[in-house]
Curated annotation (Swiss-Prot):
GO cellular component, one term: endoplasmic reticulum
Known catalytic reactions: glucuronate acceptor + UDP-alpha-D-glucuronate = acceptor beta-D-glucuronoside + UDP + H(+)
CDD domains for the chain: GT1_Gtf-like (cd03784)
Function: UDPGT is of major importance in the conjugation and subsequent elimination of potentially toxic xenobiotics and endogenous compounds.
GO biological process terms on file: animal organ regeneration; bile acid secretion; estrogen metabolic process; flavonoid metabolic process; liver development; vitamin D3 metabolic process; xenobiotic metabolic process
One Pfam family in the UniProt entry: UDPGT
Record: glycosylation sites: N133, N141, N295, N433
PANTHER family: EG:EG0003.4 PROTEIN-RELATED, UDP GLUCURONOSYLTRANSFERASE FAMILY 1 MEMBER A1
Signal peptide start and end residues: 1-27
Taxonomic placement: Eukaryota, Metazoa, Chordata, Craniata, Vertebrata
Protein family (similarity comment): Belongs to the UDP-glycosyltransferase family.
Protein name: UDP-glucuronosyltransferase 1-2
Amino acid sequence: MDTGLCAPLRGLSGLLLLLCALPWAEGGKVLVFPMEGSHWLSMRDVVRELHARGHQAVVLAPEVTVHMKGEDFFTLQTYAFPYTKEEYQREILGNAKKGFEPQHFVKTFFETMASIKKFFDLYANSCAALLHNKTLIQQLNSSSFDVVLTDPVFPCGALLAKYLQIPAVFFLRSVPCGIDYEATQCPKPSSYIPNLLTMLSDHMTFLQRVKNMLYPLTLKYICHLSITPYESLASELLQREMSLVEVLSHASVWLFRGDFVFDYPRPIMPNMVFIGGINCVIKKPLSQEFEAYVNASGEHGIVVFSLGSMVSEIPEKKAMEIAEALGRIPQTLLWRYTGTRPSNLAKNTILVKWLPQNDLLGHPKARAFITHSGSHGIYEGICNGVPMVMMPLFGDQMDNAKRMETRGAGVTLNVLEMTADDLENALKTVINNKSYKENIMRLSSLHKDRPIEPLDLAVFWVEYVMRHKGAPHLRPAAHDLTWYQYHSLDVIGFLLAIVLTVVFIVYKSCAYGCRKCFGGKGRVKKSHKSKTH
């Protein structure tokens, strides 16, 4: 062999051995404290990728759960949950069922507020049971975790990270009551940033801006009731008065499952990272069963229909209306539904208990997507460029539908008031009107035009926090100011006092000068007149 070639090869081999011996690739330890439902499904992809990169992950979950089950890429650690599975599912699934019950707006509002209160109480009691489990807390403390990855919608993970003094990375869509804005000290002008649940866009009329400004006041009481249990628990554990905002403010990085293709543009802070579409990065080939359904659809293609994991059954009358509408279009309908089969179900409609939603939407034959407007489904529609018919049921789904409708990428239906004709017309509109396909493809192109995939970006920031043991340099000094310092009210008051003092001195000086200049002449004139008389 040519000795000139061997020398470089020997050098390259030595370099590779040296690189393998370096300690930089040593894995870290991640404590994962997830939220139930679709929140966990996208966080799970991050945990899987962290495991693939050599990190150890421990997922802390309640004994009673719907979606969180043990898998080979993490260790599942459970804790006692003070509710039965039936009670838990009743509370979790209750909001979805109410979406199909017609009732007055005022009643709906107060029932929604009561549901939010029950939801927070349920998780607050669960959190108290966990944090008072001294054996488990000692075990977690001795495990020397490098970072806590948690969803602050369930603030217990943030509280645990604060208590154990471990850097935290938050993985979220948003936090109720606007707490995420307060905890990040992110500006939120009500003139163009719509509040959650208002169903407003970023272009508001005067009356809409009035509504947007007053809306948080209507939630003030229920928000106070909802967060008080966590604040009491935080104060008890940390031995000082602690607000929930203060607990959440110690997050190193906030990973928001959003971007400005879907969300309205707004100010952001240095420790806020946007990973919208993270749930639709990983795609798999269709199984033989679903491939057969798609191929059999012919030139008309398929429509994917799913109202999310929280909707297991629809009232019979409404289900029959939906089935009637679906039977009127030429496309093949793949409907994820576990309820009673409608008696009028057409031949073109296939009921399945589960479907690979993202993979089906990514197929060239996907013509439309009927969705409840959850953020995961919306992003899968955007990623794959499929126009949507949206049937929002509760929570932020109404806001999500409003965003997509504003962008001309879908049609929104009121699930309570819609008829079979309404659904039929909406489907035909988004399928046959080319503008909807063009708009969603434009959004898809914008969304995909990025320097790094959302999953890689999320994993990078988790590893970043592990490497640097937090990210205090990204935390704005606004956290250390009082409310009057933040708004510079003390400075304004000081400057105003100076101005008023100067004005007062000038006024007094002028008054004194006037008296000196004109007061003496007046007295002279008066005395002169008295002498002439």
